[in-house]
Design a protein with these regions (language model features):
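N-terminal amphipathic/hydrophobic targeting modules at extreme N-termini
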Residues: 193-202
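N-terminal active-site beta-alpha-beta segment that forms phosphate/nucleotide-binding
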Residues: 1-113
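Surface-exposed, charge/polar-rich loops and edge strands
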Residues: 2-5, 13, 17, 67, ...
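Flexible, active-site-proximal loop/turn residues at the rims of small-molecule/cofactor binding pockets
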Residues: 52, 124, 182
Length: 208
């Protein structure tokens, strides 16, 4: 069985091989698809990752959300605890190069209000909504015990037809958007969740 490390190396190599102009074009297509998602249209406060390297670019997404009067929240990382907090921004001048050489807010004023939706990066996703990140668990910790609509972005080249190995702490996405398709996964996730609950009810005394 292929483990996460092998998957990560495989899809990193694929992503790194994509030419810069192709990255920009694919990112634009993904942004256009994202704008059409009903949950995006009706959300007020939206958490968005700040793209770097060959990740799906999010600057256009952020500009669009700000133009629509949305609260835009971006991550501020703490490398000691490997956690992050959401910080509201109103323009890109509020950013600096921070942890891991990724842009992040200059200030650390954590946003404590309701977050309706989160836009999440991934090296790869599969068709079940499972995510392959860098292995630090920042996003899984951030999304734990939340009821946020989660949208993962990746290139079609990095969408896995095979199930990505996952653990109980890994948080699945409600949507995965690529430059070729939009996967709406919340129904699948709910079905699996209720099937698990039903299975546990049938096994008296089992803790699930």
């Amino acid at each position: 069985m292929i483990d996460k490390t092998q998957y990560r190396k495989f899809y990193k190599n694929i992503r790194n091989s994509i030419q810069h102009d192709v990255v920009l074009n694919k990112s634009r297509l993904i942004c256009n698809e994202l704008k059409m998602i009903e949950e995006v249209k009706h959300s007020n406060a939206i958490f968005v990752y700040l793209s770097y390297g060959k990740e799906v670019k999010t600057d256009e997404i952020i500009q669009y959300l700000l133009s629509k009067g949305k609260k835009v929240l971006v991550p501020k990382c703490n490398i000691d605890t490997e956690t992050m907090i959401p910080v509201e921004i109103i323009d890109f001048s509020q950013l600096e190069i921070g942890s891991y050489k990724i842009r992040e807010p200059i200030v650390s004023n954590e946003y404590f209000g309701r977050i309706d939706l989160a836009i999440i990066p991934g090296i790869s996703f599969d068709r079940f909504g499972n995510r392959l990140g860098h292995g630090k668990g920042y996003y899984d910790k951030f999304l734990e015990d939340t009821n946020i609509c989660k949208i993962g972005l990746c290139y079609s080249d990095c969408l896995s037809d095979k199930k990505i190995p996952c653990q109980d702490t890994d948080i699945p996405m409600d949507y995965v958007i690529t430059d070729r398709e939009v996967l709406k996964l919340w129904f699948f996730i709910l079905t699996v969740h209720f099937a698990k609950l039903k299975f546990c009810e049938m096994r008296e005394g089992e803790i699930c």
